[in-house]
């Protein structure tokens, strides 16, 4: 399905848009959350600026990059340096406490509701906040998983224990060589299970989650579904945004809601069943919580 043009947020006030979203949430038979990087940004995960300087100022001084994202792609001279960066990166963005209660607020809105989460985020925040693992599909990987860099197999490995060891043992921005993780099958270096190219490993857990998502869609076909998109930008629209638009267009009982600061749009074809809120997720979730107690 092709859409002719996009429409931006309505002229309704923020409070009226929140009331519409609250009503759509309460009237829905099921809620499908589409979560992008903006949701984790709202939860306090800043990858540049003050937080970056506090956590990675020493790396910035030596290597010259100015944000965590760039540090992840830096061509380090050794695996010891590479894993010094990545172990600290994983620790602070996966294993340290979530800075703000944003994900917990979202879970509170979904309690006793039939929901599923589709996300491109890889920081494990949904599970850490208490979401049911069987209602989650992380399409792009997870910070807490390693995979073979070749890859020689379609397996992944939990990394929590080793990440903490590496983060604690590093000196002069290097980890001890003995801690460099290697594939137990072929001996190649392990790498992060994050989608970057065609070497990304989709393990049994990935396929099981994909099947559960498709089953959820089948079971709720033509029901009153709220497709609630939170912080989804335009980097990978084929995963969440375009499918949400298409499914809303096909199901006349569905509502599409887009919460995204500076980028709240929908096709004109579904404008009458769209709720577009140009604000960050933290502000919207706070407002929905207030609506709930009135």
Question: What residues fall within each predicted segment?
Answer:
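Conserved catalytic alpha/beta core of Sir2/sirtuin-type deacylases, generalized to analogous enzyme cores
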Residues: 1-294
């Amino acid at each position: 399905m092709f859409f002719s043009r996009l429409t931006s947020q309505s002229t309704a006030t923020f409070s009226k848009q929140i009331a519409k979203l609250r009503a759509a949430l309460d009237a829905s038979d099921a809620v499908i959350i589409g979560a992008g990087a903006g949701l984790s940004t709202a939860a306090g995960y800043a990858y540049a600026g003050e937080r970056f300087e506090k956590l990675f100022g020493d790396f910035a001084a030596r290597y010259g990059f100015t944000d965590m994202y760039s540090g992840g792609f830096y061509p380090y001279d050794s695996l010891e340096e590479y894993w010094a960066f990545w172990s600290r990166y994983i620790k602070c963005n996966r294993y340290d406490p979530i800075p703000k209660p944003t994900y917990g607020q979202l879970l509170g809105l979904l309690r006793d509701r039939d929901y599923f989460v589709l996300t491109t985020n890889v920081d494990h925040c949904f599970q850490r906040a208490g979401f049911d693992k069987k209602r989650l599909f992380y399409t792009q990987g997870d910070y807490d998983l390693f995979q073979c860099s070749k890859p020689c197999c379609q397996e992944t490995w939990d990394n929590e224990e080793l990440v903490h060891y590496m983060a604690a043992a590093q000196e002069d921005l290097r980890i001890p060589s003995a801690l460099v993780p290697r594939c137990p099958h072929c001996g190649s270096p392990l790498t992060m299970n994050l989608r970057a190219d065609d070497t990304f490993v989709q393990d049994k857990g990935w396929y099981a989650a994909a099947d559960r998502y498709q089953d959820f869609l089948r079971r709720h076909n033509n029901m009153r579904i709220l497709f609630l998109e939170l912080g989804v930008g335009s980097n990978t629209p084929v995963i969440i945004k375009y499918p949400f638009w298409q499914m809303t267009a096909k199901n006349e009982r569905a509502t599409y809601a887009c919460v995204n600061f500076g980028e709240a749009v929908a096709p004109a074809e579904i404008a009458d069943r769209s709720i577009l809120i140009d604000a960050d997720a933290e502000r919207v979730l706070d407002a929905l919580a207030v609506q709930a107690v009135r």
